[in-house]
Amino acid sequence: SFAAWPLFLVKLQPLWNLSNFSVGWVSGAYFIGYVFATPVLVGLTDRYDAKYIYIFSTLIAAVGAFGFAMTAQGFWSAAFCWGLVGAGLAGTYMPGLQILNARLDDDHRLRLLPYYTSAFGIGTGLSFFVMGWLYSYANWTSAFIYAGLSSLSAGLLVSAVIRPQPVKNESDSPRRHPLDFRPAFRNAAAMRYI
């Protein structure tokens, strides 16, 4: 779904009479959804198996894409739905990495994680290819439905292939709320990356 809005905005901008400013905000809604959902969804992987966060997030992305196809009629509805798709990405990329971290030993992790991280770029390229093809041969509604189906397919694949893994709790550290970011803000080394 990554490339659905960037490609189809050319058709939707005149259809919905959107200004360039509005088009930019709809585009940005994806990343706003991503930024706000990332700390929540990634933080939840400390308490819950990342597999379930991933599957839940593919559902969020699918709801956003299907919502776009069926309800988007202008700026607000498009921005809301596209923001949901961005939130879905937040719960698939890093939790997907956590799925591997929790299931691989150090040796396999070092060998396989570069392939996982490069898959994002490959997937983005494929998204532009598929959406470009749909741009030529289908309407925007069909493209967003296809994007939603793709998200559901990813969730079903992970559900079928990845075995559940209990989260290892560190017994010597106190259990904190997943949205309590104070420990990160107090960690100077971590703040350099934030």
Regions found by a protein language model. Name each.
Residues 3, 31-39, 124-125:
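Residue-level signature of mid-helix packing/kink "hotspots" within the transmembrane helices
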Residues 1-14, 18:
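Extracytoplasmic
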Residues 116-162:
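Helix-loop-helix hairpin linking two adjacent transmembrane segments in secondary transporters
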Residues 166-193:
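Juxtamembrane intracellular "pre-TM" segments in multi-pass secondary transporters
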Residues 70-80:
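Helix-loop junctions at membrane interfaces in 12-TM secondary transporters
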Residues 36-72:
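Conserved MFS/SLC helix-loop-helix module at the cytosolic interface between two early adjacent transmembrane helices
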Residues 82-118:
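Cytoplasmic helix-loop-helix junction between adjacent transmembrane helices
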